A protein has these predicted regions:
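Aromatic (tryptophan-biased) beta-strands that constitute blades/sheets of beta-rich domains
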Residues: 33-68, 94-96, 102-117, 153-166, ...
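Extracytoplasmic beta-rich repeat domains
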Residues: 64-77, 108-129, 157-179, 204-223, ...
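Short coil/turn segments that connect the beta-strands within blades of beta-propeller domains
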Residues: 80-81, 132-133, 181-182, 222-224, ...
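Residue position within the beta-strands of beta-propeller blades
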Residues: 83-85, 137, 186, 228, ...
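Structural motif
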Residues: 92-95, 276-281, 321-327, 363-367, ...
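Short loop/turn segments that connect beta-strands within beta-propeller blades
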Residues: 99-102, 148-151, 195-198, 238-242, ...
């Protein structure tokens, strides 16, 4: 384990500017799962029990608070009353703990880092993960840090390059940590499982090349399996020891396999851009993988799709090119059902059974989950600038962010009308 040569800065509440737009006004919302990892409770972008108002008011959802974080692409996680996220400014990465109800800063943990702005704005792309006791973050250059969730004090750290021999990918590390049981996992080309309290390495997998993806842990055929999507392709590992169970090669330009796969009924969908496309494979009892279909017609570039019934809703096409658009796609057959070009280059969630898309230009859209045709139930301009970060939901609110300015907005989903 390596220790930081420099003392990180920890700032308590009130250091950065914050605007509370509805001070003291908190609506009661039904109990719902916490958003402790990237893409929510089950890492599938879906959450129930929010009590979301639908349709939304004509004027849009109520904005509760706003916070400037600095440049970056990190999303948010929420455990209890604490929200965790990250940004970059003044040659440092900053991990923030905010009060989820008000946006008030609880603490800020800062450490030296490069902006890593190759072909984009840069800043942290990894989303912090938390179990309420610890917060974990992976920086663009490979610093993997455990922070006390209550105090903001560093507990331990590794460096995935110096300690484990990983190589920084072309656009820097962007996968997020995953907490499962007493372990924390990170994919840095090789997947590493550590004791979440001490940082002791429990196992390391072989190295599969560039890593931009967040690992998943799922039970398949009665066995706990780690699913990763790395430079080699779709990879299944034994959760107990990291041993390889299966690999489905998926060569993508620049090895950018970044979107979280989707598991449904022992079938896995995965997708990448640069013209590579998407595929669905069946996981057999012996963990061999059989291709069900492959297609060039559904290219998820950065952000994964959501599954409603047997239909996927997500973004097709390279985020830097004009062809990107929201599509509905048949999970079972690989058929494109519809396309909506007015919504592009963003992220998508499934909230109380409704599709909610944030476009790359900051428009928030409530969509009827209908494979027959695109139907926007409500839409409004939630924020400006480039919005490539995945949204998150907790405490009856949706959290949306833009990238260069790093403004995080909280919008009330419940009690609207």
């Amino acid at each position: 384990m390596s220790i930081s040569p420099t003392q990180p800065k920890i700032l308590k509440a009130g250091i950065l500017p914050m605007v509370c737009l509805a001070a003291g006004l908190v609506f009661a919302a039904p109990a719902q799962a916490e958003w402790a990892n990237l893409r929510g409770p089950n890492m599938d972008g879906a959450i129930e029990g929010v009590g979301m108002t639908a349709p939304w008011p004509d004027s849009g959802l109520e904005r509760v608070w706003a916070k400037r974080l600095g440049t970056g692409f990190a999303s948010t996680t929420v455990v209890g009353d604490h929200l965790y996220t990250a940004g970059f400014s003044d040659d440092e990465d900053h991990v923030y703990c905010l009060n989820v109800k008000t946006g008030e800063q609880v603490w800020q943990f800062s450490y030296p880092e490069t902006i890593f702005d190759r072909s984009h704005e840069g800043g942290p792309a990894s989303t912090p993960a938390s179990d309420g006791e610890h917060v974990y973050i992976l920086s663009r250059t490979g610093k993997f840090i455990c922070i006390d969730a209550q105090t903001g004090e560093e507990q331990w750290r590794h460096h995935v390059v110096d300690d484990w021999g990983s190589e920084v990918p072309r656009w820097g590390y962007s996968g997020s940590p995953l907490i499962v049981d007493d372990k924390v996992l990170v994919d840095a080309g090789l997947t590493v499982a550590m004791d979440k309290k001490t940082g002791e390495v429990i196992w390391k997998s072989k190295n599969y090349g560039s890593a931009y993806n967040t690992p998943m842990v799922e039970t398949i055929h009665g066995q706990k399996v780690v699913i990763t999507f790395n430079g080699t392709g779709l990879t299944l590992l034994d959760y107990a020891d990291g041993a390889e169970l299966a690999v489905y090669p998926w060569p993508t330009n620049y090895s950018v396999n970044s979107c979280t796969p989707i598991l449904h009924d022992n079938h896995i969908f995965f997708s990448s851009s640069y013209g590579q496309g998407g595929a669905m494979v069946k996981v057999n009892d012996d963990f061999s993988l059989d291709a069900v279909w492959e297609t060039k017609e559904f290219n998820n570039h950065f952000n994964a799709s959501v599954l409603h019934d047997v239909y996927l809703y997500g973004y097709h096409g390279h985020y830097g090119r004009s062809e990107n658009a929201l599509r509905c796609f048949d999970f079972e057959t690989g058929e494109v059902m519809w396309e909506e070009p007015s919504i592009s280059r963003g992220s998508v969630l499934l909230i109380d059974g409704h599709v909610v898309a944030l476009s790359g230009n900051g428009e928030l859209v409530l969509i009827e989950p209908n494979p027959e045709e695109f139907t926007a139930v409500s839409r409004f301009q939630a924020l400006g600038g480039k919005c490539w970060t995945e949204s998150a939901v907790a405490d009856g609110m949706i959290f949306v962010r833009n990238n260069e300015a790093g403004n995080l907005f909280a919008y009330r989903l419940t009690g609207q009308g």
